[in-house]
Amino acid sequence: MPPLPLEHRPRQEPGASMLVRYFMIPCNICLILLATSTLGFAVLLFLSNYKPGIHFTPAPPTPPDVCRGMLCGFGAVCEPSVEDPGRASCVCKKNACPATVAPVCGSDASTYSNECELQRAQCNQQRRIRLLRQGPCGSRDPCANVTCSFGSTCVPSADGQTASCLCPTTCFGAPDGTVCGSDGVDYPSECQLLSHACASQEHIFKKFNGPCDPCQGSMSDLNHICRVNPRTRHPEMLLRPENCPAQHTPICGDDGVTYENDCVMSRIGATRGLLLQKVRSGQCQTRDQCPETCQFNSVCLSRRGRPHCSCDRVTCDGSYRPVCAQDGHTYNNDCWRQQAECRQQRAIPPKHQGPCDQTPSPCHGVQCAFGAVCTVKNGKAECECQRVCSGIYDPVCGSDGVTYGSVCELESMACTLGREIQVARRGPCDPCGQCRFGSLCEVETGRCVCPSECVESAQPVCGSDGHTYASECELHVHACTHQISLYVASAGHCQTCGEKVCTFGAVCSAGQCVCPRCEHPPPGPVCGSDGVTYLSACELREAACQQQVQIEEAHAGPCEPAECGSGGSGSGEDDECEQELCRQRGGIWDEDSEDGPCVCDFSCQSVPRSPVCGSDGVTYGTECDLKKARCESQQELYVAAQGACRGPTLAPLLPVAFPHCAQTPYGCCQDNFTAAQGVGLAGCPSTCHCNPHGSYSGTCDPATGQCSCRPGVGGLRCDRCEPGFWNFRGIVTDGHSGCTPCSCDPRGAVRDDCEQMTGLCSCRPGVAGPKCGQCPDGQVLGHLGCEADPMTPVTCVEIHCEFGASCVEKAGFAQCICPTLTCPEANSTKVCGSDGVTYGNECQLKAIACRQRLDISTQSLGPCQESVTPGASPTSASMTTPRHILSKTLPFPHNSLPLSPGSTTHDWPTPLPISPHTTVSIPRSTAWPVLTVPPTAAASDVTSLATSIFSESGSANGSGDEELSGDEEASGGGSGGLEPPVGSIVVTHGPPIERASCYNSPLGCCSDGKTPSLDSEGSNCPATKAFQGVLELEGVEGQELFYTPEMADPKSELFGETARSIESTLDDLFRNSDVKKDFWSVRLRELGPGKLVRAIVDVHFDPTTAFQASDVGQALLRQIQVSRPWALAVRRPLQEHVRFLDFDWFPTFFTGAATGTTAAMATARATTVSRLPASSVTPRVYPSHTSRPVGRTTAPPTTRRPPTTATNMDRPRTPGHQQPSKSCDSQPCLHGGTCQDQDSGKGFTCSCTAGRGGSVCEKVQPPSMPAFKGHSFLAFPTLRAYHTLRLALEFRALETEGLLLYNGNARGKDFLALALLDGRVQFRFDTGSGPAVLTSLVPVEPGRWHRLELSRHWRQGTLSVDGETPVVGESPSGTDGLNLDTNLYVGGIPEEQVAMVLDRTSVGVGLKGCIRMLDINNQQLELSDWQRAAVQSSGVGECGDHPCLPNPCHGGALCQALEAGMFLCQCPPGRFGPTCADEKSPCQPNPCHGAAPCRVLSSGGAKCECPLGRSGTFCQTVLETAGSRPFLADFNGFSYLELKGLHTFERDLGEKMALEMVFLARGPSGLLLYNGQKTDGKGDFVSLALHNRHLEFCYDLGKGAAVIRSKEPIALGTWVRVFLERNGRKGALQVGDGPRVLGESPKSRKVPHTMLNLKEPLYIGGAPDFSKLARGAAVSSGFSGVIQLVSLRGHQLLTQEHVLRAVDVSPFADHPCTQALGNPCLNGGSCVPREATYECLCPGGFSGLHCEKGLVEKSVGDLETLAFDGRTYIEYLNAVIESELTNEIPAPETLDSRALFSEKALQSNHFELSLRTEATQGLVLWIGKAAERADYMALAIVDGHLQLSYDLGSQPVVLRSTVKVNTNRWLRIRAHREHREGSLQVGNEAPVTGSSPLGATQLDTDGALWLGGLQKLPVGQALPKAYGTGFVGCLRDVVVGHRQLHLLEDAVTKPELRPCPTP
């Protein structure tokens, strides 16, 4: 309401008195005066403080961390520049390595004095140098000249200097696999063979892999004869000749023998390994037989009608049963001896069984002392110490006062030292007494020593003495050396508080150290190292601070007294334990006490007051009060100090909480307790992985990852002892403070390090003792070793030092000291020693030579080459000749080669480096051209020099390394940029002395991967057998692959990186595969476009290999399946994208990477030697990485090798003594390029202007456009868009969704994004109050360039695409400014931000396409030079021409662009083909036979998906899997069958399951069966799989998997029957007749989890995707073998109607039922497989094993055809022909000549009979017992159908026929039971089979068989009514147990019988 006008306002307010108004006037005046005075005072104050020219400035911002995000490799660390704080560089650590002489060999073929020097060289050279082995390079294998026999094997010593022949002490962990010994005995493994040979001292060696006689165990097969193939040694099951059909059609064979028929002849020939041929039909005649008797085992052979005796027919099998003959020769079996008799035409009688060469062992009669074992070394007996012990720590104290880890280690040391050492007592010795403050006991001297070496770690700590130490290790070393008590007071540098340092967690407050209090500690008691239980970890730290003592957290939970419960014995003696504790703590145990059994009766009132400080930080009035408190609390409590407790607090305790890790700069680690040391959880235990025993804590240096190691402990993770230290185990077992110093005597030891388990040092010859300080009697240890002169020199005049040592007078004695290892930086280059070994530098060479007492001098600077002649003590000639030659031939620097005498002058181009504009601070050698040198006397020396120019000993293992950025740069080809010309190097074609890996040789390796090539043609390379493979790859080593045109160039950097990764991965896979024994190398030949990337590789094998291309492909597929999934990603299905072909033999060599194209090779071969060729592929060194090396400034590298034939660069060279002019003097850079000299004239680089490129800027480079692949991005500096932004962008997209641009705020809501969503551009931004969303109306067309423009001003924004009317939008009101602080990401975002960006923009993928222009605020971003402009990039490529422009698709079809310039047309309905040009579908009409489904491929073709039973391209081949032949499924490891789920076959499968499977395995592992609940591997499942030949039955009911594993491994190549049973949570597994293995799934307290819920299909033999199977099944590969039977409660599942899908499954043709020779069952019988054998189901009218017997029809009215009227019950004895008793039931006496044995416990039953009836019910046959619920077997008619039912004691089985029998016609019935399996066949129907549940296999009966019914059924049998009804009808031709039953004569009870009437 507006105020009233002044004139209308009333003069007085109603209700206001005059008195009030009177007093209001002066108050208002007072208020006005007060305000006026206050304002004046403020003005005066401002004027008095104001000074012109002075103003406040904000504090300067904290300078950014220039090292953040900068990665340094190979041990270098980032350091900011002192001169320019805004710049940083990677530098190597300056600290010196320890002076420890422990030579090691690096992968660069150089010897370093210790591992630290190797790592230092690796950092300085910025290249990967791996530790190949301990000991110097070039040292010979100590086992090379040692021959071990009689079971022993050669084992080199730890220092690699000597070797011993040792017998295997245990075979645990050795590879299993039966081997055949030379004595003809099978052994479970080769290790056990050697162990037996050692024990018996017999000369036994491995003869073959596998058993000596593979046919052993197959002799009992009545249907087959086993023969061992002599070539493959595989058993072959051949049919017996006696089983041939009884056809009398005699034929005459070419051996002069008449055979019954052709079947008999062929089978007899096959069993003898012969191909007998038919000469004529009928009997053999006289002219077909040899005229004379063949002697000496020769066999008659008829060829061209001329019979003669021949030895060619004496063929022997491959079984090994050695026979020693009289001629002293051992034959593999007696047949080979007979063959030798035939060929030599003389008698060679056998001498004895077994081999002949059973020479007695030289060890017979040899007695070894000190526990040594006699072994045979080089044919002589030697006593060797078996140094291998189990490693179980059970310390004992020896009689020498030394503690040994076990009795075995004591005996081993006694043997090694050659002295008698007895076990003095159990437990460790204590020769030093108590070593305090972290010192360790030195047993030899009995004194305590301090480990002094610490690994540098940037983790300073503050000690309790107030000093800062570089690391916790340095603190403990200081405490040990000064023998003082010192603890870590706090992490970081010491901070003073007043005049003192706050320790043990105290904080500084107001100049005083105050212990923080725990206000609200998290619950959870912890046990402190003082034995006190604290309520929380916070209270533990508070107590440590108050008491000023070190208290660590021992473990979570309360402290359990060691006296009670710690042993976990569970003996129930808690009362006794509590009584003991009560007494120990001053109490009295009284069980009758009302206050508790432990009575604390202390009277402390009369004790004089004397305050004491308790260990809990509480002050007690007297010590008595403390003891009373200890008794009442039952806690450890003791007097910490006399007097009142004094904490560090000089003020009352403040409620200061310990700072939580969340308040630290980098937040918390994953444990939510430890503070992170840097971004990305740097320094956290989860990323450091520090060894808990070797490190002080789980944290590490965030920059280097170095953990804080204990003294003497080294490694990044503190997991090993440093060189010169040993006994890491002592830290764990004995609580040592660190590793123990080796303390090797430098006078007697060769090295300063020692064996890690024993501490033994490597001694010089003649020196003994564990520390190499002992000499034989009468000698003393001097500077030359053990010396006879007892006089000790006093002055250096009396001593002569050798091997580079210098004399030093010290402590009154003179001694020789070897030189130090440290060299000045100027002399830190590699040198070649006179022994042919490369050393890290000259100082290391001298130190190693001195310690090893070898005369080694420096041969030359730089690494040794192949032509250096080795020699430890070179002669003067060998030393002077090369130098003399070099002085004449090298008038200018060593990196260029002069003309040799007599050669002509040539023009040489200026060498160019690979990467232009590169300044390197690390020394590099540049490769210069090499001239052809005539083969003069100096040829070898010139060759050596030429080789050194082109090679600088690259890493031998470089191709497989993850950090390869420096390997090839340091090699000649990499740094110089030129490759040696073909034919320019003259090399003597002798066998080179291999000093390093051939990868360091100038011409690389041959195809065998180990022979260095001597020339460009590979003339010295051995032949290989090559297989060419084609692989479709999706990724390698975790990196996704996308094809770009640069991959086609073998010289490109991208090709080199990709080839390295692929070759390294394939090499690892093949070396662990089934073909590894013959594998040599793999080389990438070509990369090309495919579905993703197509790689063509050549895999080289031993030329004698028996492997075929299919073997190579299968082996690689198996390895890909079982290897880690990111190693090599191949397109699915694997078998379609991994193909191998035979490629013939290759004598050609391949170098370290690949060979390049054929054209390039041809060019190289045709090039003359006078000029360096433009393209040479021979040395194929991979290009370097694009990552920036240490200490260099790198311009963008070119992707192609610069040409070397430009004429403007050629200039003559003449020999002379002057230095060559600088490379840039001739101004070689064109078009304004800037030339820069490299390394003092060794080369130059051109820095080209924009738009120019090439080695001399001669090429015009089109503007580069970045291409994005959906997971790529470019990062630029943050947008300046607080209030205004204008942006324009041009892009081309291949997909309708993707992120174009994004910039956000890391801590707030603000962001700006530009994205494609549903085919339209969307602009989003959020200023903090909510997002604004602007969507364009113009659809984005894939493949077309679009331009968008947007603007934003405060909260308003506009968007326009392709000139459309701008779309306007506004963000919600609230905040207006846009605060951005992250990088501007273009084309995508980093992976860690995907979730956040997806939530804000609804787009989680990047752009697939190109961006060619980006304008921000009228300033265009240089995308053409994005490599330099972007601050970060990932996966960005070059944008090329679009494959879909113009549109190649017909009919307006949409073109979808693919990688590598390919496209895919999405054809509309009615169009087909790759370009939609065909209007007719290739599937119309359907070309697939058998109505198989047809699928149209994207390439335009058709693919037929063949069902089970058909194969071929169009399913035109019908496989004989149905009908008369049974189907046995053959799996190859990648095939599988998909069936209906198990739950569809059995209703109550969830409760219980009984399954049986019969299979034959070829491979040791694979999936046999799997059925799950869900497709993602979660939920319930059941599986059966092979794991290393062990069967594993697994199932999960919801709480966890039950794993039931067979006890014994199964045999490969044999049929195996397995039974599975599950009832609730309990399961059982039984293999064959073996024992049952029981198991149970986990139990749940809340839910029973007893039901198996299955919903998915059943997979047999494999699965389509193993990653989607349950993890509990633990399967990753398919089954290789044959599956014969999968039976679920007797129901066969392997039938066509149950199979839903079959992939690569073929029928097995090597079973008697499926073989090509035909059905073994005659007269139309059905063959039923029974594992390796079979059974014939005969049709009506036939019987016998092969249905060969016809039944004789009885005459009408004969009593053999009986009639039954429903009351006729006839009893017979259960008669069989052969006894099949499994228990000891005696057979009854024979009744008469025709009576048979009566059986009561039967393993099998067989019945055949013919019946005729019209009845629908009735019991036909019964056998069983009369007891309640006893076993039985019955044939009955139920509802007109015949049933066979039997019960073996577990559960009845009912088999029902599908044929009606109540037809009044004669039908033949056949019923059979074998163990638990049964079958029923009526007439000609297919047999109905079934199986009883897992359990009993025999039928227990009373010995009687009833026909026609029973008077009364047994009680308790739940049988249908039909079983209680008698049979009405006729029976005849009854067969019991394959024998005819005489119905009248064999009857025991004979009621009135009558014949069956005629129908």
From Swiss-Prot:
Q: How does it sit in the membrane?
A: Single-pass type II membrane protein
Which UniProt keyword terms apply here?
Calcium, Cell membrane, Developmental protein, Differentiation, Disulfide bond, EGF-like domain, Glycoprotein, Heparan sulfate, Laminin EGF-like domain, Membrane, Metal-binding, Phosphoprotein, Proteoglycan, Repeat, Signal-anchor, Synapse, Transmembrane, Transmembrane helix
Compartments, as annotated in UniProt:
Synapse; Cell membrane
Domain Kazal-like residue range list: 86-139, 159-214, 232-286, 303-358, 379-431, 442-496, 502-561, 594-647, 810-866
- The SS bond pairs are 92-123, 97-116, 105-137, 165-198, 171-191, 180-212, 244-263, 252-284, 309-342, 316-335, 324-356, 385-415, 389-408, 397-429, 448-480, 454-473, 462-494, 508-545, 518-538, 527-559, 600-631, 604-624, 613-645, 688-700, 690-707, 709-718, 721-739, 742-754, 744-761, 763-772, 775-786, 816-850, 823-843, 832-864, 1224-1235, 1229-1246, 1248-1257, 1410-1439, 1483-1494, 1488-1504, 1506-1515, 1713-1727, 1721-1736, 1738-1747, 1930-1956
Q: Biased composition, Polar residues: where in the chain?
A: 1216-1226
Resulting phenotype, residue 1752 to A: About 41% reduction in cleavage by neurotrypsin. Reduces cleavage by neurotrypsin by about 90%. Completely abolishes cleavage by neurotrypsin
Sites marked Alternative splice site to produce 'x' isoforms: 1143
Question: What happens upon changing residue 1753 to A/K?
Answer: Almost completely abolishes cleavage by neurotrypsin. Completely abolishes cleavage by neurotrypsin
One of the Pfam families matching this protein, by short name = EGF
Which residues are annotated as modified residue Phosphoserine in the UniProt record?
A: 569, 571
Q: Which stretches are Cytoplasmic in the membrane topology?
A: 1-26
Q: Outcome of altering residue 1757 to A?
A: Slight reduction in cleavage by neurotrypsin
> What cellular component GO annotations does this protein have?
axonal growth cone; basement membrane; cell surface; extracellular region; extracellular space; glutamatergic synapse; sarcolemma; synapse
Q: Does the keyword Plastid apply?
A: no
The site feature described as Alternative splice site to produce 'y' isoforms is recorded at 1642
Function comment: Isoform 1, isoform 4, isoform 5 and isoform 6: neuron-specific (z+) isoforms that contain C-terminal insertions of 8-19 AA are potent activators of AChR clustering. Isoform 5, agrin (z+8), containing the 8-AA insert, forms a receptor complex in myotubules containing the neuronal AGRN, the muscle-specific kinase MUSK and LRP4, a member of the LDL receptor family. The splicing factors, NOVA1 and NOVA2, regulate AGRN splicing and production of the 'z' isoforms.
Q: What information about domains appears in the record's comments?
A: Both laminin G-like 2 (G2) and laminin G-like 3 (G3) domains are required for alpha-dystroglycan binding. G3 domain is required for C-terminal heparin, heparan sulfate and sialic acid binding.
Q: Under what name is this protein listed?
A: Agrin
* Species this protein is from: Rattus norvegicus
